[in-house]
Amino acid sequence: MTTAPTSPALPASSDTAPTGPAPRGLHVITWGCQMNVYDSARMADVLRPLGYGPVERPEDADMVILNTCHIRERATEKVFSELGRLRKIRDERMSNGADRTIIAVAGCVAQAEGEVILTRAPYVDLVLGPQTYHKLPEMVARAARAGGAVIETDFPVEQKFDFLPTDAAPQTQGNLTAFLTIQEGCDKFCSFCVVPYTRGAETSRPVASVLAEARRMAESGVREITLLGQNVNAYHGDDGKGGSETLAGLVEQLAQIPGLGRIRYMTSHPRDVDQSLIDAHRDNPALMPFLHLPVQSGSDRILKAMNRGHTADEYRESVRKLREARPDLALSSDFIVGHPGETEEDFEATMQLVRDIGFAMAYSFKYSPRPGTPAAGQPMQVPEDVKDRRLAELQALLREQQDAFNADMVGTVQEILVTNRGRKPGQIAGRSPYLQPVHFDGPDHLIGSTVKVAITTRRTNSLGGTLIRETASAC
């Protein structure tokens, strides 16, 4: 940890839990992936003993954390723009007699650009990478003592897992769905991706730790968890017996937790789809029939340039095996168009793969160079207008497939986890095994239950249906 004398003294902090209600406001701004959502919740957890409780507006906060993402283009400039806004809010609070708001930058931009942040925004108090949020209380105390900014961007991911709070997070209490990080980092080094440089090497959380948090979540009312990891199907957590457990084995153990009726996982890498995971989709009804399996391109030449480690046909074969094991399995994926060197032939290969597979959902983006990644320095960068055209064509095909998938739901009966009231009086809502929002008439007491619903209509981004009342059951 390094300390830079660049900011006025912070409010004094306590290392003991308060005896009354949380006297300090905490506002967390989260950008990026589901793992950042999980990390933001855990940062709030570790700050609770210092008296911090959530507030909805940064204007009411004694501490603001900006949890950042470095994946998309212009991520760093977006951070500095937001920091400028937060500085104005802090200055206005102080002019009205409030204590000085602590401004912290966390996440992947902090990891990659920590020193730059303190140089360009010296009013920032704390800079911490995604593996060090468990050190937040120490960092707050140190910054208060030193009267300066504190930066912590090491990669002690094992320590992060060791120091997770042992009680159920307020963010999951009362919620029916939750994220649970089980693996971090990436060893794949795809040419376009910054994750290995911001999240570090692949590391898996011990089985006992995962199970303990999942049990706490279930006891607090969570009925569906999504297991998170940059390469979640590369999970190899310590099993406590001198060996390691696979993702399939972990899912089997999680499915035995009372009250936990649904399990999902993301994000997967095609190289790590093994037979045990395929068998889990066949044998474990708690594992939802919806899989996010990014392929990025349908061209073998571009896949090689991306350093993906598999071919388009190997991806097709993995999908074939998964669908053979679980015929109702639906897929989503990620695509990048305009990777350096991509030709019209390469792009057409991607379009053909999409036609061959058929996706229920997908995310597609134009390639944008990320500083420090191999692809950023590759020749034959594709012109922006070409990338725009290809992206539009790909997205049109993907939308067509998503619409067809949703249309195929009409006339089927789906098990819906009821999560909330609907927008209309007398209406409740939930989500299908395929993550589609479903709205239907029903009583509020069904919230938290899994019910069977006959799907009768499809809308642009949701489904409508009729409750089959006699099948209502607890998840």
From Swiss-Prot:
The keyword Signal does not apply. Residues 172-404 form the Radical SAM core domain. HAMAP family: tRNA_metthiotr_MiaB. Residues 407-469 form the TRAM domain. It is an enzyme of class 2 (transferase). Belongs to the methylthiotransferase family. MiaB subfamily. [4Fe-4S] cluster 1 binds at residues 33, 69, 108. SUPFAM superfamilies: Radical SAM enzymes. GO terms for molecular function: 4 iron, 4 sulfur cluster binding; metal ion binding; N6-isopentenyladenosine methylthiotransferase activity. The gene is miaB. Residues 24-145 form the MTTase N-terminal domain. InterPro entries: Elp3/MiaA/NifB-like_rSAM (IPR006638), Methylthiotransferase (IPR005839), Methylthiotransferase_CS (IPR020612), Methylthiotransferase_N (IPR013848), Methylthiotransferase_N_sf (IPR038135), MiaB_methiolase (IPR006463), rSAM (IPR007197), rSAM_horseshoe (IPR023404). [4Fe-4S] cluster 2 binds at residues 186, 190, 193. This is tRNA-2-methylthio-N(6)-dimethylallyladenosine synthase. It is found in: Cytoplasm. Residues 1-21 are annotated as: Disordered. One of its GO terms (cellular component) is cytosol. It comes from Gluconobacter oxydans (strain 621H) (Gluconobacter suboxydans). Its main location: cytoplasm. NCBIfam families: miaB-methiolase, MiaB/RimO family radical SAM methylthiotransferase. Its EC number is 2.8.4.3. Keywords: 4Fe-4S, Cytoplasm, Iron, Iron-sulfur, Metal-binding, S-adenosyl-L-methionine, Transferase, tRNA processing.
